[in-house]
């Protein structure tokens, strides 16, 4: 990952140059002037981190910071507003978790950092990473998510939490009820911001933001930076530093991508059954575009005596958690899901992704596929493509400057 071409640019202040920057974004490959301020810190030891946090980082198994960590952590710790763009699986969650933990005053049992994420699972995972990295710091951290008991949230928040990670709706609810006090908050992190700032979450984020102290530092982290994000960052950020992986580096290095041509929708199922033995070599995730399709496919696979588990946003929180737990432990090998799973969930053994349906939005492709080769691990992605999907596939190839070939017969050898 160290070879990733990362460029950075200090915040653009004048309106005309900002407009020019947005216009230039339209080009497939964006070149930025590297800002003088962004230097590369090659090791965790040289970042000026507290001793108890360093212990937690090494105990968690990190040895060397990834490209995004080498550039962003120091800037965030300095107190700068940061827009960080980094490919899925490059360690962006740990980037802001380390930065948040470094900036806490553990003696003060009040919420000092707020991290918003688009899904409950991702918020829960961020909480786990914070607790693991902060293992020697006695850090209090709570995941504030919908679908769980409100009373439990209130009790935890009353006890005092240094960091709250959560989904925007529930976090705003807790602020409104005065259970989550915002007076000591120093930092707001928006994770997977491309999804967060999609229409569904935009209003809720603004609602939360209005309650934060005016000097709050804002960090925004995302795999893709569509224009809407860059326009919005103007509203909540002061002279942000941008740390951007060049667009052509968002190709999915180490992940072999294939397609299987299926003439009709019905043929996808037969193709999947033929591939089942290949799927269970390690672990696989199969993506469908709708909850109904997930339920239908799960039932059909089970009728054909294949063992699969499934997850989507309509399932109760408890059920989703137990399915994830089974999948993480390896007890279940094949998970069928909607895009709720594609956002930042880290299951190291997953080395095969199947897009039963191509994603509706090309920016989701990297979130789905980036899942399978995390931290440089190899992975395989197989896209089922009907005749009328060819155009979408070509569009994805062009957007990510990548190549998707027809699946070879020996695909099992590649996993």
UniProtKB/Swiss-Prot annotation:
Any idea of its EC number? 3.6.4.13
Q: What class does this enzyme belong to in the EC scheme?
A: hydrolase
Look up keyword Repeat and say if it applies. no
Annotated compartments: Nucleus; Nucleus speckle; Cytoplasm
- Look up the coiled coil feature and give its residue ranges: none
One GO cellular-component annotation of the UniProt record comes to: nucleus
Q: Tell me the domain of life.
A: Eukaryota
Q: Where does ATP bind?
A: 64, 69, 86-94, 346, 371-375
Q: Which SMART domains match?
A: DEXDc (SM00487), HELICc (SM00490)
Q: Does the keyword tRNA processing apply?
A: no
Spell out the protein name for this chain: Eukaryotic initiation factor 4A-III
Q: Which organism is it from?
A: Xenopus tropicalis (Western clawed frog)
What taxonomic ancestry is recorded?
Answer: Eukaryota, Metazoa, Chordata, Craniata, Vertebrata
